[in-house]
């Protein structure tokens, strides 16, 4: 296969863009992972990794493959981008990346980040998260940001952290919070370190735009900011207000929105200084997006900028306002959780069932068949003629109308089941023929191509729960890159839609990455229906594990940690074997031991022989302590 042909095939999956150097397709057509692309080009072939485990200790699927070195490299890359921006623009303030643990609170994630040796603060958005952050914060003077709704217990935990020597910023997001903070600080005899979240007029666009702007759930209006300043003055605590925070929304796709928001928030910085508030930290919140679809555009699941441009806009925007007003450069904080974690995990699962169209030469209808059947057959015959006068669009419309007539006549008892089946199969033959004749480069054909691809797509039933593993794909139509682990050096001749194994019609992935951006079907290479491909779901490291739910009692998948050691040998260890049926039953207060006892009682009341009773009981018990997903016998 020549290089041009290989590159054309690779473009069908856009890996070069969404992969961000962490993922690529090798010459064998396998998807590979580079855990630390800046240091080494050594990679891990996911297909070969699975095959190797199959020979030694087979890994049950689905499983989440966790790459701690990618996580650590993301931390390094973000810090590096901001250092470069500060150097370029002569910015005098520091920078601190803060990890909002709500993005993924799992221990393996927090510990991997803290072990990296890079500068990192932590953010809590709830009482439970505050407990975790206090326990995990690094040495004294570690930076902690406290967001979200706060009760007195949450506030006391934060103030305890301040007493322990951490730099803990209690961000005031509701006016009702300040009274509690001042009262609890007095009880603990500690000077609180405060922040204020300003509610901006600026907002981002996309799926999360409601989390920023004037309609935001959190933040103080301009009037409330002034009221807060007066309250702190009266309490002689104005010096404690040290941090200004804003948030435009998650996954900001347009760099212009970011620049606009930074400039508006910088005006708050200036005005607060005029009021005597010596703000020293400027928290730009989240919003640093990742390119899930690889189009480098302003669409909801993409971004039209990179790390460097984002850092440049933030640092230059704040620095410029400070210089204009002769104010000190504050420490810049960003809460870039999605950009930090999205790439570091890959969900891998097997296809457990395939439904696809197979075509054989059609047979003519019986003589004197109803008109709708004869009309369908006429369309098919006309299309076989090299000089047929009907356009492809006309043939498609004619066959669609005839099929509709067939369904109507079947409903009224005019046609029987065999006639309906014959008509539906011939209609698919017509669609298949038209699909092969259409030209993807012809814009007039584009809509027909998309519609036919969706109509003719294979259905792949995948061993996973959409609601557990990709909840954002279900809830907000979030896009995730998906592709087979191998066969990617072959032309993707087929299209597929992926369905999960829950008993829910919503358990279907509706949008996929392809070379043209976003499609309703997944391009896949030829495959044996008896041996369908293993699939990888990429960039699922942010939010998905935490948001996943227990629909149909499908539990957490197994988690496998994969890294390259100093000799660049692959190290694999099981971080979590995944939930068993017993685990999930306990979540809903069903006692597995009691269920086993109930089942045993039912068996004893039957007339089954002792051997069969024992076999049934053993099977039931094995199911109780087995994986919640489908397993190979």
Swiss-Prot record:
Its cofactor is Mg(2+); pyridoxal 5'-phosphate. Its EC number is 4.1.1.19. Substrate binds at residues 282-292. Pathway: Amine and polyamine biosynthesis; agmatine biosynthesis; agmatine from L-arginine: step 1/1. One of its GO terms (molecular function) is arginine decarboxylase activity. It holds the Pfam family Arg_decarbox_C. The modification N6-(pyridoxal phosphate)lysine is found at residue 102. It comes from the Bacteria. It catalyses: L-arginine + H(+) = agmatine + CO2. Keywords: Decarboxylase, Lyase, Magnesium, Metal-binding, Polyamine biosynthesis, Putrescine biosynthesis, Pyridoxal phosphate, Spermidine biosynthesis. HAMAP family: SpeA. Belongs to the Orn/Lys/Arg decarboxylase class-II family. SpeA subfamily. Catalyzes the biosynthesis of agmatine from arginine. This is Biosynthetic arginine decarboxylase. It comes from Hamiltonella defensa subsp. Acyrthosiphon pisum (strain 5AT).
